[in-house]
Amino acid sequence: MTSHPASDGLFESFRRAEMLIARSRPLDALQALGPVLESQPNDASVQLLAGRAYLNSAQLRLAEEAFVRVLDLDPSDHYARFALGKALQRQGRLAEAHAQLKMAAAMDPRPEYQEALGELRVRMAAGQPDETGN
């Protein structure tokens, strides 16, 4: 999110939401982010921050929607793809999570992406069913 004189209040709300997420207060972050989401729903950084807050507050479907929106706006965002994979995994949608985590790791081979992909593969190999029972 970029700061413009007319949007300084929104920028401050965005920064406050970032700080609240860093302090493990995702619900407060979502409250601070509300006006920014209303005003700038097509800003990938705003959607990404909302997705992180939703994920950290176990609002998994809303997190999924936010990360999908980020990827609609910026398909090259490897972190959004990684976070989408984590949201899908937490919903028990392992095959979908695997596809997203695999793409994130291919886009940027960060250790945390590789580790998450490895852990998911172990879970899938152990036969833990996804939400469809497969």
Please report, for each region that a protein language model flagged, where it lies by residue.
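Helix-start (N-cap) detector for alpha-helical repeat units in TPR-like alpha-solenoids
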Residues: L10, A44-S45, H78-Y79, P111-E112
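Canonical tetratricopeptide repeat
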Residues: L49, A83, A116-L117
